[in-house]
């Protein structure tokens, strides 16, 4: 078949998708970089496959968002003052600070986290200004007549663009610190009695003191911590729109929240019709490994292989730490595939091979893989769940400790402290998850839960995006809580009214009693005088 015929066939296939869903739409994307882009990119590829036109706004210093690698997606690049090296240095600073901050007390850790997010908020604001104050770009966007905007709630500005372009918008996100945006802008209920607050490192089965800690974490994030400088963002958004408006108000206009989690990783909690859980949307069947890697895996025999990766966002490791890990791996009967771009450790055993990059999903889906040593990023966790591989967690930053805490509580992982673990600790943890059948059984149960859904996570995410496009929004799915003040939401006005009524009734009863009593006393005195 000629290239021309193939192109026509693909076009007809796209058009058939449009006919099924009603129409093809134009999607504007305000993305985040690094692993957040990888998650969003999976959705965008599926939207394009279904015939939609996707345009991504990217800044000139983007690291992972590379137009040359995606011919099927259009990109609109806007200039910013920072360079690619500046952003890489900034990101390394964020990761290093966040990782090291965990060694402090919880409250010192939260204080350092606040400072980190203040810096992040400033960089987001600068990027947003480069877009909304770029008249040429904004005119082009307005003339494009988009049907929907897709963004990550962790990177503000998408909601402002949607307001300026007068189009509905959908969030794709893993979490915001303390679930504050999900609660106060999305209307999501998070009872601290049984729902662990994100970044608290707690699981769904909490002791009394853990529930106390969970409550304190919630209060801290609610009343002290600010992910973004709301006063500045309120002022900025009001200036751009020419009317008083708040950051939370615009965020609350989101038509749909696509949360990249599911009940295999999360614990049960209340939810809403415009909040959909789509964890593991990037998961897919394993493909064949490269020939050399497949030969190494097959050479492991019955013992199998262990896969170790700290993900795409962590590349630096001290020589001492690398030697400690290599020493533990060298004592295993299994073969080990390690993603590592540092200097070769002196203690590296003949059973271990190092690669700058590995096909992680394909390795985890290989029948000879016995265990996965991971930093606990949501992408890796979900690939392990998808393929049913027990884990040893070495959480570093972000929600990684929470993810590993959840997997540990579900009996699918063992958690170690990255800073304090010894070579023996890592060796024993790996032996346990490989040789104790309960870990494999538990993760296979989670895998069964993950696969047993009426619709695949990716299909569900795309369905709701198309749903919002078809209905030009999804305001009918938003709860009335968005229109209530905080005291109305908690029914304090109703409680106050009922208490007032009860107090008034008690007052009337007491007054009536006193009146009758005084009358009876007067009658008694009169009878005595007579």
UniProtKB/Swiss-Prot annotation:
Gene Ontology CC annotations of this record: endoplasmic reticulum membrane
Pfam families, per database record: UDPGT
Broad enzyme group: transferase
EC number: 2.4.1.17
Disulfide bonds: none
SUPFAM superfamilies on file: UDP-Glycosyltransferase/glycogen phosphorylase (SSF53756)
MF annotations from Gene Ontology: glucuronosyltransferase activity
Gene3D superfamilies per record: Glycogen Phosphorylase B
Family of the protein in this entry: Belongs to the UDP-glycosyltransferase family.
Function: UDPGT is of major importance in the conjugation and subsequent elimination of potentially toxic xenobiotics and endogenous compounds.
Name the UniProt record assigns to this protein: UDP-glucuronosyltransferase 2B14
Originating organism: Oryctolagus cuniculus
Gene name of the record: UGT2B14
């Amino acid at each position: 078949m000629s290239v021309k015929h193939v192109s026509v066939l693909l076009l007809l296939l796209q058009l058939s998708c449009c006919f099924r869903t009603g129409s093809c739409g134009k999607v504007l994307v305000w993305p985040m970089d690094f692993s957040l882009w990888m998650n969003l990119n999976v959705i965008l590829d599926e939207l394009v496959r279904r015939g939609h036109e996707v345009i991504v706004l990217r800044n000139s210093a983007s690291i992972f968002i590379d137009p040359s690698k995606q011919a099927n997606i259009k990109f609109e690049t806007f200039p910013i003052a920072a360079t690619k090296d500046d952003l890489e240095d900034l990101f390394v600073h964020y990761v290093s600070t966040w990782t090291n901050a965990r060694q402090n007390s919880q409250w010192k850790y939260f204080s350092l986290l606040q400072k980190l997010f203040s810096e992040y908020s400033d960089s987001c604001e600068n990027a947003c200004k480069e877009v909304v104050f770029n008249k040429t770009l904004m005119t082009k966007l307005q003339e494009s007549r988009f049907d929907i905007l897709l963004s990550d709630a962790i990177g503000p500005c998408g909601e402002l663009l949607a307001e300026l372009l007068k189009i509905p918008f959908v969030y794709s996100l893993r979490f915001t610190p303390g679930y504050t945006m999900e609660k106060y802008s999305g209307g999501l209920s998070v009872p601290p009695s049984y729902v662990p607050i994100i970044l608290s490192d707690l699981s769904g089965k909490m002791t009394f003191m853990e529930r106390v800690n969970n409550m304190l974490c919630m209060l801290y994030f609610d009343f002290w911590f600010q992910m973004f400088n709301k006063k500045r963002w309120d002022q900025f958004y009001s200036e751009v729109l020419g009317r008083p408006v708040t950051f939370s108000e615009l965020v609350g206009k989101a038509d749909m929240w696509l949360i990249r989690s599911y009940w295999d990783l999360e614990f049960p909690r209340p939810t809403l019709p415009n909040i959909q859980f789509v964890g593991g949307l990037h998961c897919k069947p394993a493909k064949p490994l490269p020939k050399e890697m497949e030969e190494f895996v097959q050479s492991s025999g019955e013992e199998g292989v262990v896969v170790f990766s700290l993900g795409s966002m962590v590349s630096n490791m001290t020589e001492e730490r690398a030697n400690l890990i290599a020493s533990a791996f060298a004592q295993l009967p299994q073969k080990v595939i390690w993603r590592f771009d540092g200097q070769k450790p002196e203690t590296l055993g003949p059973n271990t091979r190092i690669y700058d990059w590995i096909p992680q999903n394909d390795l985890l889906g290989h029948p000879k893989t016995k265990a996965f040593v991971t930093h606990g990023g949501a992408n890796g966790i979900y690939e392990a769940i998808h393929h049913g591989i027990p884990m040893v967690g070495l959480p570093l930053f972000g929600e990684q400790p929470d993810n590993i805490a959840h997997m540990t509580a579900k009996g699918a992982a063992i958690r170690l402290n990255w800073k304090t673990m010894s070579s023996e600790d890592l060796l024993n943890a790996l032996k346990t998850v490989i040789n104790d059948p309960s870990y494999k059984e538990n993760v296979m149960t989670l895998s069964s839960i993950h696969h047993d859904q009426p619709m695949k996570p990716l299909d569900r995410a795309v369905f709701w995006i198309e749903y919002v496009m078809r209905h030009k929004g999804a305001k009918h799915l938003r709860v009335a809580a968005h229109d209530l003040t905080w005291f109305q939401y908690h029914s304090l006005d109703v409680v106050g009214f009922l208490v007032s009524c009860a107090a008034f009734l008690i007052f009337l009863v007491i007054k009536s009693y006193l009146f009758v009593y005084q009358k009876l006393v007067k009658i008694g005195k009169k009878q005595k005088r007579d």
